[in-house]
Swiss-Prot record:
It is found in: Virion. Keywords: Calcium, Capsid protein, Intermediate capsid protein, Metal-binding, Ubl conjugation, Virion, Zinc. The VP6 trimer contains a zinc ion located at the center of the molecule. The zinc ion is not essential for either trimerization or transcription activity of the DLP. Zinc-depleted VP6 has an increased sensitivity to proteases. SUPFAM superfamilies: A virus capsid protein alpha-helical domain, Viral protein domain. It comes from Rotavirus A (strain RVA/Human/Japan/S2/1980/G2P1B[4]) (RV-A). This is Intermediate capsid protein VP6. GO terms for biological process: fusion of virus membrane with host plasma membrane. Belongs to the rotavirus VP6 family. The N-terminus is blocked. Zn(2+) binds at residue 153. Ca(2+) binds at residues 266, 286. Homotrimer. Interacts with the inner capsid protein VP2. Interacts with the outer capsid glycoprotein VP7. Interacts with the outer capsid protein VP5*. Gene3D superfamilies: 2.60.120.170, Viral capsid alpha domain.
């Protein structure tokens, strides 16, 4: 993997900097590194592809070295370099695709394609290593089963989940009370509702709670908490739990009371925030517990009182809610990230070449399925293919 990254980094720099008119002295170190790459690769043969519709390709290396000059790089010099660069870029691209479409239930962190296994050989260690990539650093740590520290701006830690729980229900579905939620990506939307606006609740207050367990521990998280659940602020028709009928939800939004958010790790409370909105920070957690109340307004103007009558029919439904967004966090596991393209790159290559479903990843790289059942085998394989995708992204946009 180090060699593949070094090849890609060298080729990217060469493609960007070996251009007509450039002073040789400005790129002499790069050309020396480029020539070392050629010397190491010359005389070797590789084969890529041969899985799904990814074509089998054979690669052989026999390239001349780039010379020295006292002046600027001319057109002939650049053209010679470009021919070599283009071949190497095509090779690296195919090695990356070959690696991204393979998986293994055992030791999935290690190279799976024959081409990358060959590049891991001792004779290729002469290619200059550049381990400045965070993905490469973490791949090396994970490969040695040491502590890793992936940073994600918006980790897709929540599997998609959208449902409701009714604490009060009738066959007619005309006086309901309960909770509905939508968890997905890095966001939680939860709403508590009471058709009767807590008219018969103790002290005219309804209590709601929503608990979300994460598939992996997050640390040093910056979070936005808002006193509203925008996703549940408009009318909708909802299928009943048994699928036998539908019921009407017509929310009127109230501000939640006594809001509390707790971040827990292994059942122990790490951080607690009460009635605090905007930006908050959670140090270390694997569970989020949200609790809030719906309080019937003690004083109402006639127009508000008309929305919340003391008896049925209840045409408007009192609703309170919260939105929680994880803006950034550190996770030692590999996760899809809204600010990165690794999952999209891997998935698109596997779809483009009709790669058959293997023993590790779900069909279509379904992220909800993958993160819901996030086994060590899946994590190892995901770590490897995301690392390769990050290498490929340097050369192929």
């Amino acid at each position: 993997m180090d060699v593949l990254y070094s090849l890609s980094k060298t080729l990217k720099d060469a493609r960007d900097k070996i251009v007509e008119g450039t002073l040789y002295s400005n790129v002499s170190d790069l050309i020396q590194q480029f020539n070392q790459m050629i010397i190491t690769m010359n005389g070797n043969e590789f084969q890529t592809g041969g899985i799904g519709n990814l074509p089998t390709r054979n690669w052989s290396f026999d390239f001349g070295l780039l010379g020295t000059t006292l002046l600027n790089l001319d057109a002939n010099y650049v053209e010679t370099a470009r021919n070599t660069i283009d071949y190497f870029v095509d090779f690296v691209d195919n090695v990356c695709m070959d690696e991204m479409v393979r998986e293994s239930q055992r030791n999935g962190i290690a190279p799976q394609s024959e081409s990358l296994r060959k590049l891991s050989g001792i004779k290729f260690k002469r290619i200059n290593f550049d381990n400045s990539s965070e993905y490469i650093e973490n791949w090396n740590l994970q490969n040695r089963r040491q502590r890793t520290g992936f940073t994600f701006h918006k980790p897709n830690i929540f599997p998609y989940s959208a449902s409701f729980t009714l604490n009060r229900s009738q066959p007619a579905h005309d006086n309901l009370m309960g909770t509905m939620w939508l968890n997905a990506g890095s966001e939680i939307h939860v709403a508590g509702f009471d058709y009767s606006c807590a008219i018969n609740a103790p002290a005219n207050i309804q209590q709601f709670e929503h608990i979300v367990q994460l598939r992996r521990v997050l640390t040093t998280a910056t979070i936005t908490l808002l006193p509203d659940a925008e996703r549940f602020s408009f009318p909708r028709v909802i299928n009943s739990a048994d699928g036998a009928t539908t019921w009407y939800f017509n929310p009127v939004i109230l501000r939640p009371n006594n809001v509390e958010v707790e971040f827990l790790l292994n059942g122990q409370i790490i951080n607690t925030y009460q009635a605090r909105f905007g930006t908050i920070v959670a140090r270390n957690f694997d569970t989020i517990r949200l609790s809030f109340q719906l309080m019937r307004p003690p004083n109402m103007t006639p127009s508000v009182a008309a929305l919340f009558p003391n008896a049925q029919p209840f045409e408007h439904h009192a609703t309170v809610g919260l939105t929680l967004r994880i803006e950034s966090a550190i996770c030692e596991s590999v996760l899809a990230d809204a600010s990165e393209t690794m999952l999209a790159n891997v998935t698109s290559v596997r779809q483009e070449y009709a790669i058959p479903v293997g023993p590790v990843f779900p069909p279509g790289m379904n992220w909800t399925d993958l993160i819901t059942n996030y086994s060590p085998s899946r994590e190892d394989n995901l770590h490897r293919v995301f690392t390769v995708a990050s290498i490929r992204s340097m050369l192929v946009k």
